[in-house]
């Protein structure tokens, strides 16, 4: 998900989106007009700094075409400048008279103000971490340019013309500088005592070694360009040029990062939680506020997780017994389901292709059902791809990448197929509903296609975004999608249980000093997952403190607000209209979401 501060509006975008921008639908009141103009300025300021964001949004044309050959500045000076920019934006936004704003203008103001305030507080107190990611470490198994730039160049840098191919080479040349800047940022944090745990260093080096171990001419960075220029019949020795850049610029910079991480290994500790870092308890408290957009305390979240684990275990137990599974604990029975060959796709390329084909059938089936439950439907297409092999070792089981604003690049649901034993068939429906439709793709695309200002279209509040996706997993049950699929229903409950387990483990690791091994055992025992999958998940929570808590807290908020609207409106409650109310406003802090639902209730009561 793109960060609010990473990608903001350009003049080109203003022309492109004039028909959809709220400022253009009708003359705005003076203060609202000032607000929308300020939003446009904020967008332009950040787009100037984020070439990758420009490309991701499909805005690297016209006056911003030059940015297609650039990568963002990742230097320490630029990090300081970004922090100063946020303070400046907060000052300018605070000068707007909030009392003079109404409706969505007020909501938009509240959302951006919240984001600026939270970022300013974090920047002031903590002088370490990967800016804009929520991670305390600059280099880790889930983040860093060594991982993000190859994926970006392959999946988002479009190649249609010779200029596009030349821009690819320019970005490839800039990749080395980006890695060196990032290494210097990591060295800054290391001097403050911010060193990843030993297992994070090992996992990160494993992935870097895999990238570096490929001969330059066979690197995915080279093959991606070579394949696409051939498809477009673009003349020139692009493969040769790319291989030289990879061998002479990219690999040496990657080796410098690897050397740094290797130098940390002898003294790295095994403690998993951020409690051990400088001001670590406060860092975790701030992470929980930033990620969940609530004021819930670690102890409160931990207890909520334990209570949910117990109640959802009882639901799974009953469903399993009804389908002939009665021996052992719920976790042991889930383990048996993971091990049952009847639920496994062959761990071959053909088997993996069949798995993706089956997921596409599932997407088509639920897309046909959407008009019954949603008023506004996504226009942009969804495609399903494997997680790239060079990053699948440390990547999550599935994730979503938004499409471009113009719809030319579809939204993409990535599924990790490093081992099909980790994704048995009974786990796939709920994962697909979460990442695709009616989860992330529907929510993100409806926001992108809505009449919101662009700064709001790309707002990414995790508790809302992931809360919505988990809420839609529950919707699938209510839609009757599991009426004839008890195994898939168990999969849905398993994934709900996963989100409860995350509440327990995240707070356990970062507030209660759990070890990595304790967390892995609790995960595997409760959920029945293979230890390999449990390990990947737990190591993810170690580097993204608080993020794992967003899913269930967000889901419970959506369910509570839906019940609130049902109770208030009675026979006037319309699920389609409720979904429009909570989707067309874009991603929000949960407190602002409640304000939106209250306004929806008041409007429909009248």
What does each model-identified segment do?
Residues 1-15:
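N-terminal secretory signal peptides and thylakoid transit peptides that target proteins
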